[in-house]
Amino acid sequence: IFINVKCSSPQQCLKPCKAAFGISAGGKCINGKCKCYP
């Protein structure tokens, strides 16, 4: 699930993904945007 957070590294997506989907969520940075894996 893509969220509206810009990124340049996967680490930048972990906090917003966990905030949106819970502590077990993961995240990747794809094409400059965060993609979360709930």
From Swiss-Prot:
Pfam families: Toxin_2 (PF00451). The record marks 28 as: Basic residue of the functional dyad. Expressed by the venom gland. Disulfide bonds join 7-29, 13-34, 17-36. GO terms for molecular function: ion channel inhibitor activity; potassium channel regulator activity; toxin activity. It is found in: Secreted. Its main location: secreted. Belongs to the short scorpion toxin superfamily. Potassium channel inhibitor family. Alpha-KTx 02 subfamily. Selective inhibitor of voltage-gated potassium channels, blocks the Kv1.2/KCNA2 (Kd=1.3 nM) and Kv1.3/KCNA3 (Kd=7.2 nM) channels. Association and dissociation rates of the toxin are slower for Kv1.2/KCNA2 than for Kv1.3/KCNA3. This is Potassium channel toxin alpha-KTx 2.13. It comes from Centruroides suffusus.
